[in-house]
Every structure is written in structure tokens, then in C-alpha cells.
């Protein structure tokens, strides 16, 4: 009986005291959840934050943290649900809509992604990230033409948006517009040195133009940037074969096959990559407090 008295009290408490207890319980659960999120104890963070939201469902910061924990545990539909509730409360918040678009992309729900982007575009027609996400939604639907249009709009707003230029170059090349793809590749090469994706685009452009000697050199730069690039070895092998270098072509093909059978297991940089991703999704700087 004493245990129950300790837990529930021997008599009813005044309303003000009960309110204080509820507030205290909410704060303890919320900040335990935030701390667990920082320490990457995601399952425990979810438990705490769900219980906190049961007490106070109007706390949007709590829902934001919960959405991040769900994303980290690959519970994307639950994350999207939390973001939807945040968007209902803050319909003018572009950051929430962009997060929804990002999660929809991870779920491969390109229709939802496009819908969210349209809402965001109505709020801020000059937000380059909105056009970038819309382009990715178009790509998901196989609509490369409109994807290029969206990326071009983003680049008109910000010519230094390298991710948009890279994706546009890749799509232009895929669509057979080699000359315009070459312009994007050259612009990126002048701006970014030693980037694997940029170098690979440049190599593929040279190959598509039929400039095999230049393509071979470009693929070599890709391999310098990433010695484990299976695509670079395989495609350079094709280029070397076209140049009549059968020995080099066979060596590249063998290297690609070997890496495909036993893919390299990187031991460094994984945690930093995860942390960087979480920071991108973190308007409250939960992960950016170091």
C-alpha cells in the first residue's frame, strides 16, 4: 500500500500541483528524448518523445525531434506523419515542407514529394531548394524534361548551386543533349576540384562526344579521386577497348568485376556522413552543438 501511496498519493492533489507535475513529467521526457537523440540512442529517444507528445501534442519542437529519430531508424512513414502534423500547425514554414519533401524522396513517394514542393513554391517562388526537390520528384516520375526545367529555374536564381548543375548535367547527358551537358560539366570542373561526381560527368561527356583519349584521362581522374569506383573502371575499360588498348581494357574490366564481387568496406567517415545528414535535417541544432 505504501508503494501506491508514493506513486499516486494518498489523497487527490490540488489542480495547480497536478499541473506542475504534468509539466515536469513532460519536460523530463522531452529533454531525455533530446539527449538520447544526441547520443544516437534512437529507440529510447522515440519512447521518450512519444510519451512527451501524449502529454503535450502541441509542442512542435518535440515532434521535430521525434521525426528525426524516426528518420534515423528508417521509420519514414512515421517521420512523415509527424512532419504533416507540424505543417498543419505551421503551414507557412518552408523548412518543414522541405523536410517533408526529403522524407517523401527517401520513401520514393514522388507524388507526395511533388505536391509538397508545389505548396512550398506558392509560399516562396524564389527558394532554390524547392526547385531542386521538385526536379528530383520529376526524375522519380521519369519526367526528365520538366526536371531539367526546374533545375534551370534553380540555377537562374543561384548560378552557384552546384548540386543542381550536376544533376542537370547528368539529365541532359541522359537525354542525349551532350553539348549542354558539356557546358555544365566544364562549369563544375572550373568551380570544384577533385570531386568524383563532377569528374565522372566530365568523363562520360567526353565519351559521349567520342573524344576517347580525353575520356580515358578523365576516367583516370575519377579513379584518382575514388580508387573503388566500379563505374569508372568499367567505363574506362570500354574507352580503352575503343582505343585499341585491349590489355588495359581487360585490366579495368577485371578490376571492376573483382570490386563488384567484394565491395570495399570503408571504415572511416561513416559516422561523419550520418552526422552531416542529420544536421541538414536539424533546424533546432540538436546535432550541431559541438
Regions found by a protein language model. Give the residues of each.
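Short coil turns that delineate tetratricopeptide repeat
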Residues: 57, 91, 125, 159, ...
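Structural signature of tandem alpha-helical TPR/SEL1-like repeats
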Residues: 40-47, 73-85, 107-119, 140-153, ...
Amino acid at each position: 500500500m505504501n508503494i501506491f501511496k508514493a506513486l499516486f498519493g494518498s489523497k487527490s492533489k490540488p489542480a495547480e500541483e497536478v499541473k506542475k507535475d504534468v509539466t515536469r513529467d513532460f519536460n523530463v521526457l522531452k529533454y531525455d528524448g533530446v539527449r538520447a537523440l544526441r547520443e544516437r540512442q534512437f529507440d529510447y529517444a522515440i519512447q521518450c518523445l512519444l510519451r512527451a507528445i501524449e502529454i503535450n501534442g502541441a509542442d512542435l519542437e518535440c515532434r521535430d525531434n521525434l521525426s528525426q529519430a524516426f528518420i534515423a531508424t528508417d521509420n519514414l512513414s512515421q517521420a512523415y506523419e509527424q512532419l504533416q502534423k507540424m505543417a498543419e500547425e505551421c503551414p507557412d514554414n518552408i523548412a518543414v515542407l522541405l523536410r517533408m519533401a526529403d522524407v517523401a524522396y527517401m520513401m520514393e513517394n514522388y507524388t507526395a514529394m511533388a505536391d509538397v514542393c508545389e505548396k512550398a513554391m506558392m509560399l516562396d517562388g524564389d527558394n532554390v531548394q524547392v526547385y531542386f526537390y521538385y526536379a528530383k520528384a520529376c526524375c522519380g516520375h521519369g519526367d526528365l524534361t520538366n526536371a531539367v526545367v526546374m533545375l534551370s529555374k534553380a540555377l537562374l536564381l543561384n548560378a552557384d548551386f552546384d548540386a543542381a548543375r550536376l544533376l542537370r548535367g547528368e539529365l541532359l547527358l541522359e537525354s542525349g543533349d551532350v553539348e549542354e551537358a558539356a557546358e555544365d560539366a566544364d562549369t563544375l570542373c572550373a568551380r570544384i576540384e577533385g570531386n568524383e561526381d563532377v569528374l565522372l560527368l566530365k568523363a562520360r561527356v567526353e565519351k559521349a562526344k567520342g573524344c576517347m583519349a580525353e575520356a580515358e584521362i578523365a576516367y583516370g581522374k575519377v579513379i584518382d579521386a575514388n580508387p573503388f569506383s566500379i563505374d569508372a573502371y568499367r567505363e574506362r575499360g570500354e574507352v580503352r577497348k575503343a582505343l585499341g588498348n585491349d590489355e588495359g581494357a581487360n585490366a579495368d574490366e577485371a578490376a571492376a568485376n573483382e570490386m563488384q564481387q567484394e565491395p570495399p568496406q570503408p571504415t572511416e567517415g561513416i559516422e561523419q556522413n550520418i552526422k552531416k545528414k542529420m544536421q541538414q535535417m536539424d533546424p533546432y541544432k540538436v546535432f550541431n552543438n559541438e
